[in-house]
Structures are given as structure tokens and as C-alpha cells.
Amino acid sequence: MNTRRELPDSPYLAAARGRKPARVPVWFMRQAGRSLPEYRALRARNTMMQACFDADLITEITLQPVRRHGVDAAILFSDIVVPLRASGIALDIVPDVGPVIDHPVRTAADVAAIRPLERQTVEPVEQAVRMLTAALGDVPLIGFAGAPFTLASYLVEGGPSKHHEHTKAMMLGAPDTWHALMSALTDVTIAFLQAQVDAGVDAIQVFDSWAGTLSLADYRAYVLPHSARVFQALAPAGVPMTHFGVGTAELLGAMSEAIATSGAPGVVGVDWRTSLTDAAGRVERGSALQGNLDPVVLLAGWPVVERAVRAVVEDGRRAVDAGAAGHVFNLGHGVLPATDPEIVTATVELVHSL
């Protein structure tokens, strides 16, 4: 059942849909996280996986940065590997390491053993979405999932990887096994996002954290068709959809195609290595842009932050003049744990004043 709210005055939704917002909208990837003392207090009593499968904790953690910073959107607190865990894959999130898979997926038999995501396994996530949409007032809620390629990399490597050698070896050397794996993970991603959409999220963002390790040719051949299927499946909901990766300057056009083929409103996330104006010339016409302050800037003191924030806002305006449908201010990746929350709040206030 569609329980989506009407939020006609949301600056975030306006910019994401290509309409002129009343102000430049701003939110931050990883805005709910270790930079916040209230988050650290909750996490001291709960593991990451416990937090990701507890509706009350998901709700509270998601709300924390909205209360503190006054951002223009909340993003559902979760982790990229949550749908994998919900599908029965044995894994854990190890502090200071990241997701660790008990039995890496390396063969066709391993791929065949991946189970579909059963809706009841993510009921706490759906419940949290319903609680959040009731609590957020006029602030939109962004749903969250990892893209099939990034999920595949975690599964094949067994955890985080610098070179993704096992992943690329399967992709290039065993393409039938690779596409079977990507198809299974695309189904898992669709099911996880569909659960969030049905529960009432106002937008979604798909994180392809490791896509930047690929050439454009390999991305088009081995990844794009599967990512496009995710967006095509979610398009009937009509919510804005964002596609984000790190180090993806050469992939921005293809990543925007993944959404554009669905016909739904599309936003492409841009990291700090690429100017927004340059990105506007790379993405499909009609795409909005999101980004792209370097997260490290927030550690450099307020005078540096202020100059950089003003530069990003101006770059966003030039990008819109160059053809981008809109601009959502964000970082080029997640908020770093050492970031002073007061600097984040001041950044929101500054963006809103410009």
C-alpha cells in the first residue's frame, strides 16, 4: 500500500525533481554516525547489526542529525550489507574493518545458494520507515541500498578490498557466473528498496561505493544492465532516485543512464574530484546533481569550510545553468567520524543562507 506523504514545500524533493527549490537543500551522507556523540552513546550498547535490525534504534539514529543540524532530508539508518544478512548470508560488521563475509562467493554453486530476500526479514526496517514518516513532519525520508556491484564485491572478496581482484577475476574470467551473481543481487536490492518504498520513503539512494574501480567499458558491460534494472523496478513508485559512487567521474554518464532509462526523476551523486559544472556536461539531460564538498574540508577549520561551501554552492548554480536539473548540497562521500558536529550545523546554516 502506498502511504507516501505529500511534501510540496520540500527543498530537497523540489531540487531532485528538477523544480526550483525555495533554498539550496542540504543533507549529508553518513549524517547519522560516529561524528555525533548521541550516536556513539547508542552504539556503545549495541552492535551495528543490532542497530540495523531494531526499528526503535533505526528511527532514533535516523532522527538524530535532523534534530541537531536542521538538514533538508533524513536518510534511513542502515548498512549496505543489511539485505545480504536478511537473505541469510553469514556476515558481520567488524569495528575498524567493515563487513566480513564468513564464506566468500567464488563459484557458480556459491551463487546458486544465494536466497531471495523474504519480506518478513526486513520488517523492522519497514516499521522504522513508518515510524519515521510519522515523526519527520515536512522532512523527507530517503531510502537506502547498496548497488549490486558493491554487494557483489563484498561477497566475492569476503570484505573490503583495495584492488577487488577476486571480483574482477570472476567478472572477466567467468562472466556467466558473474551475471548470475549480479542478477541474484539485483533481485535482493530491488526487494529491499521495494519494502522501503511500500512503507513510505519519499526518495531512494543507491550507493555503488566501489564502482570507481571499474573502467567505463567494464561498467557498461558487466554492471550497468543490472543497476538499470534496479531503477526500472522502482520507477513506478515515482519517487526521486539518486545514484552515487566514489571516484566515478568517467562513469557519471553511464550512471545517469541507469536512472534515465527508467523515466523517473534522477539525481547523480558527484564526489569532490569532479566539479559539478563538469558533471553537468557528463550526465543525461534532466538529471539533477548532488554533492560535492570534500569531507576532509570539514576538519580544516571554519574559514576554510566557509570558502569551500560557498564555492560548491556557486558551482552548483553554474551546473544548473549548464543544464543540470537541480543541485542538492552534500559531501562527496560520508561525514568523517572526527568531524565536529557544530561545523556540520554551521554548514547547513550557511548553505541555507546562500
From Swiss-Prot:
SUPFAM superfamilies: UROD/MetE-like
Record's catalysed reaction(s): uroporphyrinogen III + 4 H(+) = coproporphyrinogen III + 4 CO2
Subunit structure: Homodimer.
Record-level Gene Ontology MF annotations: uroporphyrinogen decarboxylase activity
Protein name: Uroporphyrinogen decarboxylase
Binding annotation for substrate: 30-34, 79, 154, 209, 333
Biological role: Catalyzes the decarboxylation of four acetate groups of uroporphyrinogen-III to yield coproporphyrinogen-III.
InterPro entries noted in UniProt: UROD/MetE-like_sf (IPR038071), Uroporphyrinogen_deCO2ase_HemE (IPR006361), Uroporphyrinogen_deCOase (IPR000257)
PANTHER family named in the record: METHYLTETRAHYDROFOLATE:HOMOCYSTEINE METHYLTRANSFERASE RELATED, UROPORPHYRINOGEN DECARBOXYLASE
Known pathway: Porphyrin-containing compound metabolism; protoporphyrin-IX biosynthesis; coproporphyrinogen-III from 5-aminolevulinate: step 4/4
NCBIfam families: hemE
A Pfam family matched in the record: URO-D
Entry coiled-coil feature ranges: none
Enzyme Commission code: 4.1.1.37
Source organism superkingdom: Bacteria
Chief location category: cytoplasm
GO biological process terms on file: protoporphyrinogen IX biosynthetic process
UniProt KW Membrane keyword: no
